[in-house]
Amino acid sequence: MGSFSIWHWLIVLAVVLLLFGRGKIPELMGDVAKGIKNFKQGMADEDAKEDPRTIDAKAEEPVKDVKKTTKS
């Protein structure tokens, strides 16, 4: 009941081959690889395009304490 035997894995493999066929599985794996490659390339492009920015602002006076008037 704990782990699957070799027969379980062979049956799963046979079902997958029947559903997808022999030629479809390599196509799916190629599409997954292309997706991963495009994702990595997009992340690298995003990092390269973004220039560091500075904030030009003046410091304001700190906010004074406000007395709470709510009743508990």
Swiss-Prot record:
Function statement: Part of the twin-arginine translocation (Tat) system that transports large folded proteins containing a characteristic twin-arginine motif in their signal peptide across membranes. TatA could form the protein-conducting channel of the Tat system.
Positions of transmembrane segments: 1-21
Signal peptide (UniProt feature, chain positions): none
Keyword set, alphabetical order: Cell inner membrane, Cell membrane, Membrane, Protein transport, Translocation, Transmembrane, Transmembrane helix, Transport
Quaternary state and interactors: The Tat system comprises two distinct complexes: a TatABC complex, containing multiple copies of TatA, TatB and TatC subunits, and a separate TatA complex, containing only TatA subunits. Substrates initially bind to the TatABC complex, which probably triggers association of the separate TatA complex to form the active translocon.
UniProt membrane topology term: Single-pass membrane protein
Entry-linked InterPro entries: TatA/B/E, TatA/E
Gene Ontology biological-process entries: protein transport by the Tat complex
Localization per Swiss-Prot or TrEMBL: Cell inner membrane
Name of this chain's protein: Sec-independent protein translocase protein TatA
Protein family (similarity comment): Belongs to the TatA/E family.
Domain of life, source organism: Bacteria
GO molecular function, one term: protein transmembrane transporter activity
Organism of derivation: Brucella canis (strain ATCC 23365 / NCTC 10854 / RM-666)
Region (Disordered): 43-72
Gene Ontology CC terms, in alphabetical order: TAT protein transport complex
Family matches, as PANTHER family: SEC-INDEPENDENT PROTEIN TRANSLOCASE PROTEIN TATA (PTHR42982:SF1)
Stretches with biased composition (Basic and acidic residues): 50-72
